[in-house]
Amino acid sequence: MKLAMIGFGQAGGKVVDKFVEYDRERNAGIVRAAVAVNSAKADLLGLKNIPKDQRVLIGQSRVKGHGVGADNELGAEIAEEDIDEVQGAIDSIPVHEVDAFLVVSGLGGGTGSGGAPVLAKHLKRIYTEPVYGLGILPGSDEGGIYTLNAARSFQTFVREVDNLLVFDNDAWRKTGESVQGGYDEINEEIVNRFGVLFGAGEVQDGQEVAESVVDSSEIINTLAGGGVSTVGYASEGVEPRKNNGGGLLSRLTGGDEPDDNLDTAHTTNRITSLVRKAALGRLTLPCEIEGAERALLVLAGPPEHLNRKGIERGRKWIEEQTGSMEVRGGDYPIPGAEKVAGVILLSGVTNVPRIKELQQVAIEAQDNIEEIRQESDSNLETLINDDEDELESLF
């Protein structure tokens, strides 16, 4: 699937920057174009892989390149005012070669959480291609203002995109890690999961063709109903075969020698085990998978370690667990890979306790901020006025 990726804000820019690096290293053919948008000049300068002419600084007249200070209402205003500058960078994207737009943003900050929904609305008005969002939720320990920003941005972002893929920082934090190390690892996790998902079906010249191809239309159809999506991932190390002579026919027939039957059974069992682990393990947004409207399963790895029987069994298991009859599946052969990975996209999930918890904390933070503001006005009056009101101000 060929994507035009737009990173909005600091977190969004870093994730898209990482996607460009991933795409280049693996020759995956996912990122057709990449743009970074920010109101903080320093954040744009910190990017390594996005071309400099595709980095857009907005809000210079309002915030002088210093960011919006976690004020996402200001972030939304700036994005609306400077949308033409962003469009200028998007104009250089060969849209006829793109399957969809992906707007990536952290939902807890100011620029991204305010500006990403504005950009998504703008793109949907102009282009016929689907516009997806990738929203990153802040950790619950990051503070009330970031939780409030995330709850408000999430609500708006879901309405403005064709589908919102969500990654929850809370589910991926590790104790004792540095701030920088923690975010780098989280960005790595995001890119690995979505890289396998979007990379399936993008075959370059000379590459192995999948037995059951997952092309961009299958991903688009899985995301078509809108709402919120989550992604599961599991992998297992394997020994790649020295001579990759098996190819498509051997995978269809179960091997080129009769004694390959044991290997076929082992391969099938590994695939079904990976599917279960991906669906029931750590999802990008933890939720109950029962009730998901649609699902897509992609198995990636050396071609000799993939087979149709395992994928069919995995697909059937997902149907049983979700109750959905709209479960697509396929493989993504990567000759010479040292692991087999299973990726599951669950679209239209609704039983998400983390979102309800986020909203509850946000409401408390909103009430608390208003209360403190009122108290602050009263306390300031008490401080500056004398008790008997005998002093007169200068003017």
From Swiss-Prot:
One of its GO terms (biological process) is regulation of cell shape. GTP binds at residues 10-14, 110-112, 142, 169, 187. Changing residue 218 to A: Reduces motility. Does not form rods. No division defect. Keywords: Cell shape, Cytoplasm, GTP-binding, Nucleotide-binding. Disruption phenotype: Swimming defect. No differences in growth rate or cell size. GO terms for cellular component: cell division site; cytoplasm; microtubule. It is found in: Cytoplasm. Pfam families: CetZ_C, Tubulin. One of its GO terms (molecular function) is GTPase activity. InterPro entries: CetZ (IPR032907), CetZ_C (IPR048737), FtsZ/CetZ (IPR045061), Tubulin/FtsZ-like_C (IPR037103), Tubulin/FtsZ_GTPase_sf (IPR036525), Tubulin_CS (IPR017975), Tubulin_FtsZ_GTPase (IPR003008). SMART domains: Tubulin. PROSITE patterns: TUBULIN (PS00227). Belongs to the CetZ family. Involved in cell shape control. Essential for the development of a rod-shaped cell type required for efficient swimming. HAMAP family: CetZ. This is Tubulin-like protein CetZ1. The lineage of its organism: Archaea, Methanobacteriati, Methanobacteriota, Stenosarchaea group, Halobacteria. The gene is cetZ1.
